[in-house]
Amino acid sequence: MDKVSYIGPVILDEPEEFSLSEFARQVVAMEAERLYYSNGRIFFIEYDTIHGILDDRLVIVELITYTSFTTVGEYRNWIVYYGNDDTAEYVEKIKDLRGDMTIIPVLRTHDRFIRKIEEQISKGQFRSFASQ
């Protein structure tokens, strides 16, 4: 085990904050399969794990290549995006299905990736594109 080094998670760029509708539009365009909820925010995370040999050691690095978030308050299960109307909802239950809907599940978590991102946000190290 002393021949393995683990580094990460490492964030390559500052997280980006969006309004709910812009966040939903973005995650649909990026074909997100799931989103993560923690402490009143929903997060979208793209990450990669790379590995290689360095000085006779196996080095494993977890890289957060992109992350964005929106502030929502309480936890709900789904983000629903309506393509024809270009609108989004953050809902507990899905009521009516429409052909232009994209439904993305929101999972409640507080894993090491989310903690690392929240640490950066709490230091003010993020870009905000959310309308005031």
Curated annotation (Swiss-Prot):
Provide the protein name.
Uncharacterized protein AF_0513
What species is this protein from? Archaeoglobus fulgidus (strain ATCC 49558 / DSM 4304 / JCM 9628 / NBRC 100126 / VC-16)
